[in-house]
Structure formats: structure tokens, C-alpha cells
Amino acid sequence: MKIGIFDSGAGGMTVLKAIREAYPNVDVVYLGDTARVPYGIRSKETIVRYSKECANFLKDKGVDLLVVACNTASAYALEELKREFPFPVFGVIEPGVKEALRKSKTKRIGVIGTQATIKSGAYQEALKRAGAEVYSKACPLFVPLVEEGMIEGEIPKKVVEHYLKDFKGKVDTLILGCTHYPLLKREIQNFLEGVNVIDSSRATAKSLKDFVKNEGSGSLELYFTDRSQNLERLIKLILGEEVEPKITSEVFVL
């Protein structure tokens, strides 16, 4: 079985890692749209267009199932992708919401994400339907920090404090509403001591169990639309192994 995964950049490899750990025999093709990262500052129309282009690229690679490992694309494009493509399509928002509701004792839940994800209200609406009190905030500097490989040290620490100071004492659970954010999880946990920090990558992998046959050769192909300065370092950091990335321009519709 072959699974396709796409994200706006390198952060979606956190989902890729969780899926490979859960289903080690499946073949996986990953696409990071690093030439156009971040999606979180784009209009809905642009996010949908980029998402369809990424999905088409993976369709041409012969995938049997698609995971949208980008919260912004999940918020704005998931339903259109489900309608347009002939294979099952999964996002990362619903699994993260379910995991947060399971872990929270007070139902006072925080959500952080890109500007577009927070503006969409996708997390807030799903949590409020379950009776949660929701606190949300956009953290637009987190993705550039991760893409630059700046995940530890004084700069990310100060940025985390700047964005998350209003959550202290208000929430018992925080959803990382962007697949880049788990790379900053240590700094976030250090600042919000005692708060459940929800990384939806593992929850997303679990949500596939009724649809994935753990069959194949366990192969992995990594495609990116641009070779960013820290790409190889991020691959090693997230996946724990060195995998040669392939750079492609086939995604773009000219």
C-alpha cells in the first residue's frame, strides 16, 4: 500500500514519522511545498489551489490514500479534496480535537496555529460543539523558526513566551494546530508547565487504522519544491535518519 502525505513545508514530516512507526511496511511518498511555505498567510482560494496541486502530484505517484499533514490545508481544502480525488483523504484537525478532549480534565483548551488556521475557526467550532471553553491564538513566527532550524535557544524561547503568556493558568490542554509546532514542543512544555500539549501526528496515524493495510516494502520518497538551507538537517532531526530529498517543480501549474 502507498500513502501520500503533503504539507506546506518540512513540518508535516512529524506526521510522516508517526505513520511510518505505526505502519512500517507501507510505502510512503511525502511532498513538502517548501517553495510556497507558509500557507498560513495565504487566502482561502490560494490555499485550496496549492492543496489541489500537491494532491495531483501525489495522485500521479500512484498513492492509495492521502494525508493532508497541514492544518491550514485541512481547514480550508479537505472537503474539496475528498470530493475531487478517488482515494480516501484524511486531515489532521479532527484527530487532534479528539485527543485534546480525551486528555483535558477541565475542558479549558487552547489552540495555536497559523493565522489562516485560527481564522478558519475549524478547531474552535469542533471543540465548542463538545462543550469546551476555547482559547485560540495565531503564532505566525513559529513556522519560519522551524523552517530555519531554530528550535532551541534564546530566540525560540522568547517567541514562545511572547505568544503563549496569555494561556498560563487558563488552560489544562493545548493543541499544536500546525504540524511544524511539535519541533518547538520542548520550549512550549517548559513554558506551560503541567499543561497537556497535544501533537496531532500520532492521533492522525491512529485514525488511519481501519483504512491502512500494513503491506509494502516500507519505501520512502521525499519530495520538496525547493531546497531550503536547513532541509537536510530538518529531515535528520524529525525522522532520525538521513534521507536524500528530491527537488521537484512538477507541482506547479503554470
Swiss-Prot record:
* One of the protein's GO biological processes: peptidoglycan biosynthetic process
- Keyword presence, Thylakoid: no
Name its pathway.
Cell wall biogenesis; peptidoglycan biosynthesis
Reactions it catalyzes: L-glutamate = D-glutamate
- Which amino acids does the record list as binding substrate? 7-8, 39-40, 71-72, 179-180
One matching Pfam family, short form?
Asp_Glu_race
Which GO molecular function, any one, fits this protein according to its record?
A: glutamate racemase activity
Q: Which InterPro entries match?
A: Asp/Glu/hydantoin_racemase, Asp/Glu_race, Asp/Glu_racemase_AS_1, Asp/Glu_racemase_AS_2, Glu_race
Say if the entry is tagged with keyword Secreted.
no
Provide the top EC class: isomerase
Active site, UniProt feature: 70, 178
Keywords tagged on the record: Cell shape, Cell wall biogenesis/degradation, Isomerase, Peptidoglycan synthesis
In terms of superkingdom, the source organism counts as Bacteria
What SUPFAM superfamilies does this protein map onto?
Aspartate/glutamate racemase
Cite the EC number: 5.1.1.3
Q: What does this protein do?
A: Provides the (R)-glutamate required for cell wall biosynthesis.
PANTHER family associated with the record? GLUTAMATE RACEMASE
Concerning its family, UniProt says:
Belongs to the aspartate/glutamate racemases family.
Q: What is this protein called?
A: Glutamate racemase
Gene behind this protein: murI
